[in-house]
Amino acid sequence: EKKVTDKCAFYGVPLCKVPDRYVLGGAIGKDARVVVAVTDEGFARQLQTMLDRSLWG
């Protein structure tokens, strides 16, 4: 986790943490995932919005 956090901070990449790998996988329609990189800005914004709604109400 620290390595990914440090890399994101160094390169100025937004980071969104979720409680477990199943939430992350479900958000992109896949099986459990530990890390996902999203290069499409529109999809990244929508994914972050969906995760925020599902995790924090």
Swiss-Prot record:
Fetch the SUPFAM superfamilies from UniProt: L30e-like
Kindly indicate whether the keyword RNA-binding belongs to this entry.
yes
Q: Name one Pfam family in it.
A: Ribosomal_L7Ae
Carries keyword RNA-binding?
yes
According to the lineage, what is the superkingdom? Bacteria
Q: Which UniProt keywords apply?
A: RNA-binding
A GO MF label: RNA binding
Function of the molecule: RNA-binding protein that recognizes the K-turn motif present in ribosomal RNA, but also in box C/D and box C'/D' sRNAs.
Family label: Belongs to the eukaryotic ribosomal protein eL8 family.
- Name the record gives this protein: RNA-binding protein YlxQ
Q: Which gene encodes it?
A: ylxQ
